[in-house]
Amino acid sequence: MGREDMPDLFGINGTALQLRSQRMGVLASNIANAGTPGYKAKDIDFTAALRAAEGGTDVSSAIDKATLYRVPVMPSLDGNTVELQNEQLAFSENAVGYAATLEFIRGRVDTVTRALKGD
C-alpha cells in the first residue's frame, strides 16, 4: 500500500501548511531585502493558491500562479518596493495561520494515535 492509496487524514490542511510555509519564505525574503535598491517585493495570494490546489493543480504550480509583485503605496526613490510595516504585518498574520493549521494537524495525529492504541 503506497502513500497514494492512503486516505488523506489532513484534508486541505496539509496543502495549506505547505502554502503558508512557502509564503513565510517569500515574506522573510522581502523583509531581508528592505534595504536593497531595486528589490521588488513579492507575495503569494494564499487564497488563490489554496483554491488552485483544491481544484487539482499541484502545489508548486499553484504557488507560481499565485505569486505576485507588490505595488507599493509609497514607492521609494531607489526602486525598492518593500514596505517594511506591511511585510511584518503579513508575516505575523501568516505565522498565526501557520500555527493554527499546524495545531489542527497535531490534533488529527493525536486522534488517530489514540484510535490506533484503543484509548
Explain the meaning of each model-derived region:
Residues M1-D119:
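Amphipathic alpha-helical polymerization modules
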